[in-house]
UniProtKB/Swiss-Prot annotation:
BP GO terms, sorted: ATP synthesis coupled electron transport; electron transport coupled proton transport
Topology versus the membrane: Multi-pass membrane protein
Stretches that traverse the bilayer: 29-49, 60-80, 115-135, 139-159, 161-181, 193-213, 234-254, 268-288, 302-322, 339-359, 360-380, 400-422, 442-462, 488-508
Highest taxon listed in the record's lineage: Bacteria
Keywords assigned: Membrane, NAD, NADP, Plastoquinone, Quinone, Thylakoid, Translocase, Transmembrane, Transmembrane helix
Name of the protein described by the UniProt record: NAD(P)H-quinone oxidoreductase chain 4
UniProt record similarity statement: Belongs to the complex I subunit 4 family.
Pfam families according to UniProt: Proton_antipo_M
EC number: 7.1.1.-
Predominant location: membrane
Molecular function as annotated in GO: NADH dehydrogenase (ubiquinone) activity; ubiquinone binding
Length: 544
């Protein structure tokens, strides 16, 4: 394999490409910097917000800040982002200590812009979902806003050291949100979360330092500078493996997933929405940004492993979800299963499958947030998460049943919903990916289809157990009021893009198509340079 050849140079050139329309660095409005710093600065000002004592003032303040942040990201997309440009846009670079490679560097392309919009959108709805929070509301919304800025920074920064800092910044709010407002086992879930994610994220720091100080030249943590370094095959493989572990925990990849069911099992509804809607997408984004883009030669070697791990995710998590009797854990394992399609798409050398993986992240962000919000709303009424203690509540909660049905159908990839389009793109894209042998493609698509079959079984049976049959005696005295306007509004806001993407996916896919095609094309020269191909890879494939 030609490690120091044209593939790596091409990757560096493409990562650093700034089209003429994108070179409006410091003379245009700093959209991304504002979107990052506004919620963080606003969170610090929460102690100054006047409040009568019931948290109402803080709630409106946090909602206003998150909505403003969302409008800023929309403004960035409409005024400074061109989806036909594959390179970085909305750039802002401010050197700080150039000799140490330290500075502020942000930008957006097709990999990051859709996820920045998703982050600000879900966070706004999470603030609305947190309206019933009365215990320490100032601290709760402080953490929620700080998390918003940190997550946007993960997708926007173009410096690996800044990426590590942003990655770590969002860990602290999640830990505290779990440890303070979680369920009975909140301390265990929060500790497990921080141990898994903090320890694994050390690999990000080690890789960043190793790459910045290797290969000669000035010290820099800029993505484009790191990609331009001439790295040996062994060094590339070590960096790739380390980052795969770090990002695999966040995605999560089986067997690095065990923190997620515990975290979801104890979290409140708004924290659920942020975990499922945004946090998991950070892992998929990072695999695209670093593993697939920065190490094209190593990615060729690891891609079959990603595909196999994706199938394991789909089948194992679907079977485990089928066996769960706890409602939160059932949906949590369903999330792990759906993220398996992201792994298959990233491991594929087909632009269609890779585009499907990107769409799956966006789709699952919306669907996962909606399902977990409904789980929280249902628990507030029934005060139980055990399916054995539910049943027959459909007569008293018809609006809630309608919302559950719509979101469950979206999760099982009903045609006309976003999940159907994204999973179909991954299936068809991988089936037509000439980089892999035909038997391997048949086995992978066939195995993944098992998960697709299991999903409607466990989701529809879940609906039956919650809403149909005889009402359980335990619920006879429960305050089973139907969905209130706030809850209907939140679910409607999530269902509109779910259905819109399902009916016309180009609304979203066009926003990242050029960048995804560029990422996949980077691996073509690496594949052609693979002088000793191994099954299931072919030599010099014709990319679909």
């Amino acid at each position: 394999m030609c490690v120091k050849g044209d593939a790596q140079l091409a990757a560096a050139a493409e990562i650093s490409t700034l089209q003429p329309d994108a070179a409006k660095e410091l003379d245009s409005f700093p959209w991304l910097t504002t979107a990052i710093l506004l919620p963080i600065a606003a969170s610090l000002a929460i102690p100054l917000v006047p409040d009568p004592g019931n948290g109402k003032g803080v709630r409106w303040y946090a909602l206003g800040v998150s909505l403003t942040t969302f409008l800023i990201t929309v403004g960035a997309y409409l005024n400074g982002y061109d989806p036909d440009i594959a390179g970085l846009q909305l750039r802002q670079v401010i050197p700080w200590v150039p000799d140490l490679g330290l500075g502020w560097s942000v930008g957006a392309d097709g990999l990051s812009m859709p996820l920045i919009l998703l982050t600000s959108f879900i966070t706004t709805l999470a603030c609305l979902a947190a309206w019933p929070v009365t215990f320490k509301p100032r601290l709760f919304f402080f953490l929620l806003l700080a998390m918003d800025g940190g997550q946007i920074a993960v997708f926007a920064v173009q410096d690996m050291l800044l990426f590590f800092l942003a990655w770590e910044l969002e860990l602290i709010p999640v830990y505290l949100l779990l440890a303070i407002w979680g369920g009975k086992k909140r301390q265990y879930a929060a500790t497990k979360f921080i141990l898994y994610t903090a320890v694994s994220s050390l690999f990000i720091l080690l890789v960043a330092l190793a790459m910045a100080f290797s290969g000669g030249g000035p010290v820099s943590f800029e993505y484009s500078d790191l990609a331009a370094k001439h790295l040996g095959a062994g060094f590339q493989a070590l960096c790739y493996a380390g980052l795969l572990i770090a990002f695999g925990v966040k995605l999560p990849i089986v067997p690095l997933h065990t923190w997620l069911p515990d975290a979801h099992g104890e979290a409140t509804a708004p924290v659920h929405m942020l975990l499922a809607g945004i946090l998991l997408k950070m892992g998929g984004y990072a695999l695209f940004r670093f593993n697939a883009s920065m190490f094209p030669d190593a990615h060729v070697q690891f891609a079959p492993l990603l595909v196999v791990l994706g199938v394991v995710n789909i089948i194992y998590a679907a079977l485990t979800s089928f066996a769960q009797r706890n409602l939160k854990r059932k949906i949590a394992y369903s999330s792990i299963s759906h993220m398996g399609f992201v792994l298959i798409g990233i491991g594929s050398f087909s632009p269609l499958a890779a585009s499907g993986a990107m769409l799956q992240m966006i789709s699952h962000g919306l669907i996962g947030a909606s399902l977990f919000f409904l789980v929280g709303a249902t628990y507030d009424r029934t005060h139980t998460l055990q399916l054995d203690e539910m049943g027959g509540v459909g007569q008293r909660m018809r609006k809630m049943f309608a919302m559950w049905t719509a979101c469950s159908l979206a999760s099982l990839a009903l045609p006309g919903m976003s999940g159907f389009v994204s999973e179909l793109m991954v299936f068809v894209g991988f089936a037509t990916d000439d980089a892999y042998t035909l038997p391997f493609r048949i086995v992978i698509d066939g195995a993944a289809a098992i998960g697709v079959i299991l999903t409607p079984i466990y989701l529809l049976s879940m609906l039956r157990e919650i809403f149909f049959g005889q009402e359980k005696p335990e619920l006879s005295d429960a305050n089973l009021v139907d969905a209130e306007p706030r809850e209907i509004y939140i679910i409607s806001c999530l269902l509109v893009p779910i259905i819109g993407i399902g009916l016309y996916p180009k609304l979203v896919t066009d926003s990242y198509r050029a960048t995804i095609e560029q990422v996949v094309a980077r691996d073509e020269s690496s594949m052609k340079a693979l002088t000793a191909p191994y099954l299931p890879l072919r030599s010099a494939p014709k990319l679909s």
